[in-house]
Structures are given as C-alpha cells and as structure tokens.
C-alpha cells in the first residue's frame, strides 16, 4: 500500500471512505494481476466500478491456491486460516507488520480507549495451537501493549483467571 494511504486510512471519515476505497480498488487492479484477472472475469474494472457496492471481493479460495500479494514483496510474516482436517489453509501475507499492528491497535483504541486502561485476557483454546494464527498474534500484541502484569493467556488456568477477574 502506498505510504499516503497508510496514513490516510487512519484518519478517514465517512465522506472520504468511499473515495479512498475506490482509489485502493484501482491500485489493486493495476498492481495485482491475480485480482485484475478475477475482476475482469466478473466484468469489473476501473471503468465500471463507481461505488463501494461495485468493488468485487476476491474469494477466500484464492488465498488457498495463490500467494495473494499486491506488488512484489518479501512478507514480514504470514497468517494461516485454521481450516479443517485435510484441507488447505488460506494464507494472508503481511508486507509491513508495523502497519498491521498499528491498524488493529488503532481499531481497538477507537472503540475502547487507551490499551493501557485495559487488562487483556486471552482464552483461545484451538487458536493457541496454531503457530500462524492472526488472532493469537493480535491478542499477544494487545497483552504486551496493555502493560498490565495480569494481562495474558489464561487457557486452563481457571483459578488464576478467577483471581484476576475478582
């Protein structure tokens, strides 16, 4: 994502949202051959996409069979879907982990206030076993950023959880 968008998206209002989304659609179309191919297959292009409702969404199955990336880059990290037994997991390649972290932290703080005002308690049984789960990554980062010693993962630690909550 070009630098101007990374700063623009965090201060966007409802009026500017649609225009920015259309700009990002055009960028994706121009710089992601897989996405452009899909958009063309469903008869969508910058010539006929004029509103949010016109923007085509890439099906999840593409994330299982392709490396979905806009421009060429080495990813900082990738996340995998949980999937089910015997299936191929989808992958989400992250170009800039700092931008990813800024995004979910700003989203949290926009809804709940400063992270330092919160204890973050993670109860994520099946996710903790997945080494590339985005939810575990996000919760771990929120735990770290909260700065509270009582923040943490409490899977199977019911006594400790009870004490923390009381």
Functional labels for PLM-detected ranges:
Residues 1-80, 86-116, 121-122, 126, ...:
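Nucleotide 5′-phosphate-binding alpha/beta core
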Residues 134-138:
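Extended acidic/charged loop-beta regions that coordinate divalent cations
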């Amino acid at each position: 994502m070009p630098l101007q968008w990374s700063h623009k998206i965090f201060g966007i209002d409802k009026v500017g949202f649609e225009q920015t989304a259309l700009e990002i659609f055009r960028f994706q179309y121009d710089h992601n051959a897989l996405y452009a191919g899909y958009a063309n297959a469903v008869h969508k292009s910058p010539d006929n996409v004029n509103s949010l409702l016109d923007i085509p969404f890439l099906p999840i199955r593409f994330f299982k069979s392709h490396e979905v990336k806009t421009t060429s880059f080495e990813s900082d990290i990738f996340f995998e879907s949980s999937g089910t037994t015997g299936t191929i997991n989808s992958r989400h390649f992250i170009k800039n982990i700092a931008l990813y972290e800024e995004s979910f932290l700003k989203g949290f703080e926009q809804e709940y206030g400063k992270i330092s005002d919160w204890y973050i308690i993670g109860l994520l049984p099946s996710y903790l076993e997945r080494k590339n789960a985005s939810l575990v990554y996000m919760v771990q980062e929120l735990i770290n950023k909260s700065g509270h010693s009582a923040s943490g993962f409490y899977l199977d630690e019911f006594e400790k959880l009870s004490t923390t909550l009381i």
